[in-house]
Amino acid sequence: MAVPARKTSKTKKRMRRGHIKLATLNLAPCPNCGELRKSHVVCPSCGFYDGRQVVAVKNANN
């Protein structure tokens, strides 16, 4: 069975794992209510998407 010839150093290990991280959210203000929401997703606070009401929200501010 294959085994590593040498111990992997902390630096080498951290360099390899450098790309493993959480992606940042693309937040944009909702044009209808102004709250931050994810891009290309229905606004959870008002239910609008692309300028029209898509989802009925119970506690709409407008």
Swiss-Prot record:
Entries under PANTHER family matching the protein: 50S RIBOSOMAL PROTEIN L32, LARGE RIBOSOMAL SUBUNIT PROTEIN BL32
Stretches of the chain forming a coiled coil according to its record: none
Annotated signal peptide: none
Superkingdom: Bacteria
Keywords annotated in UniProt: Ribonucleoprotein, Ribosomal protein
GO cellular component: large ribosomal subunit
Homology family: Belongs to the bacterial ribosomal protein bL32 family.
Protein name per UniProt: Large ribosomal subunit protein bL32
SUPFAM superfamilies documented for this protein: Zn-binding ribosomal proteins (SSF57829)
Single GO BP term: translation
A GO molecular-function descriptor: structural constituent of ribosome
InterPro entries (UniProt xref): Ribosomal_bL32, Ribosomal_bL32_bact, Ribosomal_zn-bd
